[in-house]
Amino acid sequence: MNYRYDSLDRPVIKYYNNDNPNNAGYHTVYNANGLVGLHKDVVNTQRTRYTYDLAQRLVRVRRNVGGLEDNGAFLAELAYTYENNTNRLSAYTLELLLGSGTSKVKTSFTYGNKNGSQMTDAVYEVRQNGGLHKTYTYDGLGRKTQTMMSMGGANKPIRYTYVGVKDNRTTTMLESLDNFGEKLSYTYDDNGNIETIRKNGVLQETYHYDVLNQLVRADSAAQNKSFVYTYDAGGNILSVKEYAYTTGALGTAVKTTAYGYTDGTWKDLLTSYAGQTITYDGIGNPLSYRDGLSMTWRNGRELASLTKNGVTASYLYDESGLRTKKTVGGVVTNYHVIDGRLYGEYTGSHRLLYMFDEAGTRYSFLYNGSTYYYVFNGQGDVIGITDGYGNMLARYTYDAWGKPLTITDGAGNDVSGNAGHIANVNPFRYRGYYYDAESGLYYLQSRYYDPQTGRFINADGVGGKVGELGSHNIFAYCENNPIHRFDPIGQAWYDAICRGISTVLDMIFPGSKARAEKMMNSPSPYDCVNYIT
């Protein structure tokens, strides 16, 4: 990667080694206040203009396509509105060109009224185009206790309770989630890891961890199987053993999957899986992978294409490495990524527009003119989809590492082979990650995660943290704790069970970098107890 700078040492052109920066780079123009005013993406022939108010707050992002000057066609616009006396975001208006037509939605937030004994820094209502979608209730510690969904004139409550600890202290660790008629209950070990999950009082999952908080055993009543995981000293998975389901003493393993690491220089490089050889390029990108997958790469760590069962998929990205297009067997999907967030996509006549709440959670989407809602468990997995009236249309289940197990309709019928069913139209699954059906991988922005192996397919671009042994394995997913953690951009893990519950820490705000810094600088992104004591 190469850069050119202006007289103030600001990057104005970014380009790759073999490219001519004048016809294949990314160009940035700054305004008089030193803020980014214009961005030209020569690779994708897109031009993005940024507009600010007198307080230097970002108020509009407008993108054209097909021309790098003002002659391009409209592609997208994202406008922000703020409260008069604060920097709090009160609304955002999204307009996208999806295929041959445009879609426009305004999402607004209502904050607490101090005269009504409400917290003024908490959102109490979320609206779309003026219509009420979500109403929140909080306890005296600012924890969300209920989300009331407004659906087709009816109210559907989602209720939360929390775990208490000794010495009159409490936490934001979720104890129960009552969600669309199903109650999920959680218990934790002494380190705060999820120990059991029950659905409507019936035990579903039991988990065990080692002293490094790595998952070492999962007893899944839902799968009627138990699994044992072993690791080497560097945090590499050595084997997965499958047993008949039990929460007690294990019998004889019925299946063993072995992992191999034979590279003498790069000891964390997975070179074999279940007897299949895996090969890499010089910087640790896989070329031949499990189950016949083959891959090509560009610009360092960008996955350019993969082939499976004779079908080839290719991918394009923007300057930040975020995906803008994929083509699978000749079928093209275009993505609208603005401010680091995927707001919409279209494939032929299929159009999806994603809606976000005050915490930045994708909670609903518009598909070909109809509204659908996501149903989440406590860890942020998408476990269902409802229509605009709250009727369950789709359900998903996953194994401990996020591999999809079942895809059914609301009545429990298998629809995994029905590409047109809303369950398969929706790409967001485990932890809210984007699932690529063509590969079985999750796209986590900076790289791809393989739930089959429980590892990232290539190396992390961010080094480990001092004092955290597991973080130095740059292929390990969430330091081998897939139950309690999530990694939204493939670079750092966070506590999954705490997100989306706090009122102030995760407010949506223009600027994905600002959101990331806010998350990284929280009292402890790993410890729910430190949020409220």
Placement of each model-derived feature along the sequence:
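Beta-turn initiation residues at beta-strand->coil junctions
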Residues: M1-L8, I13-N20, L38-N44, T48-Y50, ...
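Low-complexity, glycine/serine/proline-rich disordered segments
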Residues: A24, A76, V105-K106, H133, ...
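A residue-level detector for well-ordered beta-strand positions
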Residues: Y3, T28, Y50, Y80, ...
